[in-house]
Regions:
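The feature captures the beta-strand-to-loop junction immediately N-terminal to the Walker
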Residues: 33-35
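H-loop (His-switch) and adjacent beta-strand-loop-beta switch element
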Residues: 214-229
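Walker B catalytic motif
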Residues: 171-172
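ABC ATPase NBD Q-loop/coupling interface
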Residues: 59-75, 143
């Protein structure tokens, strides 16, 4: 599904990734681990197409396509999802409108008609129950006034509704208490399926137990990894 070969990346002239190699197959969950500054978030942002990163060498292929030539919205329509370490607020844009617009963008990419509004609300409410979220979240601005834990749950809700082929979760569990961590972990685990893959970006092993073995990120270069056993 995802193939990264000899990827090197700089930011403002400073080398962050140096010759990274990674293979992520369908049905796999990989944990990308390492201390602050080792390039974990850089890799996540490069995959999502965030500007400001210079690729000096290497290739990235996703579903057989050259990912690096695609715009961020094209990557998203192909089923690549990034869960942010620090989810941004979007005042004036309701959660339900964002979710519906995102779902319909993916459906258009697949040649499907727009989702029925009634069925869509039923789907979203089902996923919200899994995330222990009240219906009132739908009418609120995206992450506007949300606590840290609510923002992280909202990120996972987006993933549950969109059902991406590949989700890259950048320290989604960071700063959560034990109860919120259990809810977020349940949401992530509910998406495990043979046709999907997950990469969890973490500093420590404690939150990466769903991936085996972890992939450790060293000073600019990650060590090799192997596919985890089936869930």
């Amino acid at each position: 599904m995802l193939s990264i070969r000899n990827l090197s990346v700089t930011v403002e002239g400073k080398k962050i990734l140096n010759g990274l190699n990674l293979e992520v197959g369908t049905g796999q969950v990989h944990a990308i681990m390492g201390p602050n500054g080792s390039g974990k978030s850089t890799l996540a942002h490069v995959l999502a197409g965030r500007p400001g990163y210079t690729i000096t060498s290497g290739t990235v292929h996703y579903l057989g396509q050259d990912l690096l030539v695609l715009a961020p919205e094209e990557r998203a329509r192909l089923g690549l999802f990034l869960g942010f370490q620090y989810p941004v607020e979007i005042p004036g844009v309701n959660n339900v409108y964002l979710l519906k617009a995102a779902v319909n963008a993916v459906r258009r990419q697949q040649g499907l008609p727009e989702v029925d509004a009634f069925e869509f609300l039923g789907l979203v409410r089902e996923k919200m129950q899994l995330m222990h979220m009240e219906d009132s979240f739908l009418s609120r601005g995206v992450n506007e006034g949300f606590s840290g834990g609510e923002k992280k749950r909202n990120e996972i809700l987006q993933m549950l509704v969109l059902e991406p082929r590949l989700a890259v979760l950048d320290e989604t569990d960071s700063g959560l208490d034990i109860d919120a961590l259990k809810v977020v972990a349940a949401g992530i685990n509910s998406q495990r399926a043979p046709a999907r893959a997950r990469s969890l970006v973490r500093r420590t092993r404690a939150a990466a137990d769903s991936a085996s073995p972890p992939r450790r990120s060293g000073p600019g270069r990650a060590a090799s990894s192997h596919p985890p056993p089936p869930p």
